[in-house]
UniProtKB/Swiss-Prot annotation:
Protein name per UniProt: DNA-directed RNA polymerase subunit beta'
The keyword Iron-sulfur is assigned to this record: no
UniProt source species: Chloroflexus aggregans (strain MD-66 / DSM 9485)
Compositionally biased intervals (Polar residues): 1449-1468
Enzyme class: transferase
Source domain of life: Bacteria
Gene designation per UniProt: rpoC
Keyword vocabulary terms for this entry: DNA-directed RNA polymerase, Magnesium, Metal-binding, Nucleotidyltransferase, Transcription, Transferase, Zinc
Cofactor: Mg(2+); Zn(2+)
A single GO cellular-component term on record: DNA-directed RNA polymerase complex
Gene3D superfamilies, A to Z: 1.10.132.30, 1.10.150.390, 1.10.1790.20, 1.10.40.90, 2.40.40.20, 2.40.50.100, RNA polymerase II, clamp domain (4.10.860.120), RNA polymerase Rpb1, domain 3 (1.10.274.100)
Family: Belongs to the RNA polymerase beta' chain family.
Amino acid sequence: MLEINDFNAIRISLASPEDIRSWSHGEVTKPETINYRTLKPERDGLFCERIFGPTKDWECFCGKYKRVRYKGVVCDKCGVEVTRAKVRRERMGHINLASPVSHIWFVKGTPSRLGLLLDISPRNLERVLYFASYIIVDVKEDMLQVAREMVQEEYAARREKIQKQAEEKRIELSTQLTQDLGGMETAQRSTQRQIEEDYRRQRDELVGEAERLRERLEEMSGTLADEDIIFRGVTVVEEGELINDNTLDQLDELVEQELEVLEERRRRDLADAELLTDAERERKAYEATQEQERLQERLQRELDMLVREEKEKLEQLDKLKVGLIITENEYRQLRDVAPGVFRADMGAGAIRELLERHLNLDKLAEELQAEIQTSQGQRRKKATKRLRIVEAFRKSGNRPEWMILTVLPVIPPDLRPMVQLDGGRFATSDLNDLYRRVINRNNRLKRLIELNAPEIIVRNEKRMLQEAVDALIDNGRRGRAVSGKGKHRLKSLSDMLKGKQGRFRQNLLGKRVDYSGRSVIVVGPNLQLHQCGLPKKMALELFKPFVMRRLVERGVAHNIKNAKRAVERVRPEVWDALEEVIKDYLVLLNRAPSLHRLSIQAFEAKLIEGSAIQLHPLVCAAFNADFDGDQMAVHVPLSRKAQEEARTRMLSKYNLLSPAHGEPIITPSQDIVLGCYYLTMVRDGAKGTGKRFASIDEAMLAYEKGLIDIQAPIWIRMNGSISGKSDRPVRELPPASDGTPRMVIETTIGRVLLNSELQPPLRFRNRLIDKKGLKEIIADCYQYYTSLRNLSEAQLNEVRAAHGNKHVQELARIYGSEMTAQQADRIKTLGFRYATLGGMTIGIDDIEVPAKKYDIVREAEQQVAEVEKQFRRGLITEEERYQEVVRIWQEATKQTIAAVKENLNPFGPVAMMSTSGARGNINQISQMAGMRGLMSDPTGRIIELPIKANFREGLSVLDYFVSTHGGRKGLADTALRTADAGYLTRRLVDVAQDVIINIEDCGTEEGLWLHSADDGELMEKLQVRMLGRILAAPIYDKTTGELIADRNTEIDEELAEKIIAAGHESVFVRSPLTCQAEHGLCRMCYGRNLATGKLVEIGEAVGIIAAQSIGEPGTQLTLRTFHTGGVASADDITQGLPRVQEIFEARVPKGKALLAEIDGVVQIIREDEGVRKIRIVSTNVYTDEYPLTRGFTPVIESESDVYEGQVIAEGPGGEQIIARLSGKAFIQSDRIIISQEDHEERELVVPHNARIRVENGDRVMAGQQLTDGSANPQELLELQGREAVQRYLVNEAQKVYRSQGVNINDKHIEVIARQMLRRVRIEEPGDTGLLPGELIDSAEFRRLNNDIVSQGGDPATAATVLLGITKASLNTDSFLSAASFQETTRVLTDAAIQGKVDYLRGLKENVVIGKLIPAGTGIEKRLERQHEDLISEMARMLEEVQQAEKSAEPTTTALPTTNGHQAPQSDTDALLRARLEELLSGGNDHDDEEDSDHPDLSSL
């Protein structure tokens, strides 16, 4: 195996099938795990010993070979290699898949990597992979042409056939019509004949009948008719009428008429018959025509349909291209249309074939580049995304088809163990179930393929295999998650990595450790600052191995076994051994939650009886510990290096200052403060008041004799002078003969006692010492003793003797820390002693209710009654009434607090506790003795009924009920806040974890202006803000011009005072925000390390410190948004923790303020519907003057409009003056002025609840706030640029913390802000090979551009991007860091495709792979290694130069040695290295980063 520390970068990429097989020790073919009778692994199963190694050390499966002497032998019977059982943690197996399957990470991620590469939508890709659609994987172009021709021929034949059929039908119709018409002619003639015959017959009948009647009449002529004689219905002769010739004439007439009627009928019938025939003929002709037309239409339809079908089929053939997705129906049709032309398939096999055979990455990259150049909008965006993936594959050497698995790796069995439980049942890792499903399905698929099963069954089995592999890799990512017994979701390989319980966060970034224990803590008031009390039995367990060894060394036990027995029986000698052992070891104490680095500190252990750990009271603040049941963990650092680190860096006495703000964190509190306050109080009129003493000893004697009280004001003569202010009279005396100052001072014995415990340089403090005073003492002590000015050589030598020969600054820090620790311990002892002697207790009688309270309440009640009366009369609204009532009661509460304060006895224990800062404040005392005042309901709205009682008087039921709201909300808030603050800290740590001080100076000229104008209620004074910074430019005295300090000078307390005294209101300092270091920060830009008060050392992990400093006070911040009077208004802006998250996540803030988009003048517009608008008008006037000399005359009118290029004046010789810009021309006696007005307007709609900050006519700048609220940092970046946003982020974060009384130094927020603004987004890539829209580190961007410019190419352009801390963490260069933060699978997917290399520059990535972190003491090794690499590289470069010179100039060369003599060529190598070593060791303090990265070779 490779040596664990023998690499400095780690690469992740896709594994090829060959890689997977090369890792494997054999194929797993059976789903069995172990045999339940023999409890031995099954052969070829998931726990097979042949593949994964033996289950017992040095013993094969069958037992033929046992013992270590057969090491490396492979048993000929069972095939198991004789080796250690632990190989089962590292040996892998594999499964040969019967059908390729896709890797779900590359399919289901967003965006789908496979989909982007193949340009297939994720939905379609899924349909193909899960056997719902076909995808075309191959098209034969030559056969495609043949198929086209065949289709065309087929349709041509079909067209011909149809047309032929139509022609035949047409002829048939025509013949039919002719026949029909002929038949009609015949019928017509027959009808005419019939009519003629009928006519003749009827005529003959008529004539015959007439003849017969005539004959009869002629016979009867001259006679009278004996009856009516009728002819055809007409009476010719009536009865009794005479028959004569007239009668015959009449008959002839009738016959004539009848004949006419017959003739008429004949003509009519003939005409009708003809008409009927014509009509019938026309009908037949019409029907024939219709039929012809129908036939024509049908023909046309059929032809059109054929054309359409042909077109569709040809189109289908034309569309036939590799990668086309088709449904099953379409596949069948196409197969019929073009058999053998194409091949379509389903599943991962089809996709693999596409990737392997048809994806030309180089060609695709060129096409996408061209598309990016020519397209816009969504198309360009998509092309960029695709190009990014294509380029990733091209550069990384990964093959796209490796995203499809043909071989599945099987992880070692000991990483997915199977253990027997008590009841004989087995518990197994979920992975075994998931692997078993894969193997079962794979084996079934193999059998089905062998049996030539129907396609549909095989396809279904392939789909099930795909789903089984999906579940193994990432269960639940697609479809329903596979669940085991009891419905629980099986944990897949991805789940093993993801989340808090995943491999990264559970086992790599956080581990359980041996040599640790935990117990309850109790106070250890007699301990020194660097000590802790460790229970004996706990210590014995922790140091057991060491004690055993010591017992053997001392001869108490003969061997380790005896020693172990002795320890277990706790023989008396064991305790002596333990005492000896423990002297050499420090232990680490840790209290969870570890919110900052002071939550783990090192202590010397003192053995104590009992079972609780004793903790020094002064370190409680750092641990945030109290003694109400808190527990702490103890750890033993084992190695010599770890012990050394604990002793030099982690010992509690070296951690006196808070890294967040540089003030002491070892500050006396509570009892100690109370004791010191009691001691330094002056009680006028106490016993002995006014007495005078010649010396301190005399006064102490009087006190011990009981003549004076400890708090009595007395006069004492003493040597020395007052330190700071004095609250009692002081009279200076002439100095003593040796020059010692002397004075007579009014003080108390208590103050003398306190001062006697102070280090001499800190005396004499003659004032009331409260908590703040004690803090000052500690700070002054540290400052005094760490300043080299105040230390003698003897003191430094004393430290040297104890701590070795270190840098003088480091020695001063150690000495100062030790002196301060001693001082703190002395104050602690004194405070506890006098808190006890003073006997300050608190009882119910100490709380007196002031008589004024009742008057205040009565008056308030009257005012409220008056307001109610006005409301009932309708003079004020409900809202105004509510606001006024709340105001009255708030005022009453204020007055009550004042009355309570006034009423307090300053010497009473309650007042002393409050005013000294030991415990409690005036508000709490007021709740006990005054009135509780107004409460708010669960929404945060103030309830207008106050609680008029106090705790001394007792609350009524209603009062108590109203109080519960606030109490419950407080508890809920605290619980929520803790989790939120923890998560915020985690994100901050993640974004800043690689910010380490790496170099001395980055050489930047940039910096940050600090202005005194920014001083305010919430911001600290300029003098405080500039402390510990490094000047970015020289600073001079304003009046004399004398240099006060040069660039790169650290601003200490003295220099800060000088700068302020010189009247400077702004200082230009270096800042992490402007640091140009490529990785991490440089010392100069960071400045002072607040935890030591000295310039930061190389290797300090300032990013982590910044994150902890911001995150640790997070729990103190309020959670909710504030509601003013319960009514949501524009004031309802987020505060507290949510606001901090809003700032660091760069989110659009709630209640966002409107910002001016351009410089200009404001106009406020109010419209009818209550809509308000702000219009900003920007008018810029440009003028251009043209002198009229030598007889030039204008050719334009004054105040006329002219355009650019127009002639405005001409000279006597025809010379012309041309207008250079368009605008209005004004003619004066000797010149023409053209004035151009540039007019721009922006209109913004004001939200209805926003308060406008500007007035009509105000001038505003771009980026200025127009309404109340918080600005959106993204808009600010756009409008005002990077600097403005940096300033905004720092100031806004500080506002939140300062408003809660939390002090954090600006530079911590600057470190985080720098990380948020580290990236730039590429706009135009130039010749850099970057992609538009790509995010890249700004240092990398600068380096790339410099390289390109030096080669004469076009540089890229980019815009700064503001990322929230979560986004910034995920965009880090280290994939290990990003993957262990969030979205593990997405980060690893991208990193694998890109073949990313992690150079292990941050802390997390080194912790993950188990290397020393590149910070603190861990950076030394790294620097040594870089040093060696640099020397080797430079030596190589020099050799190359010499080789080139040699080949150009064939003379022997010699190099100058360090002393100037010539060295023969043979010694060159050794000489070169020695010279380079010398140069580099001399050049450690580089002024410029570039020097260290690119050494000047000319000097060699």
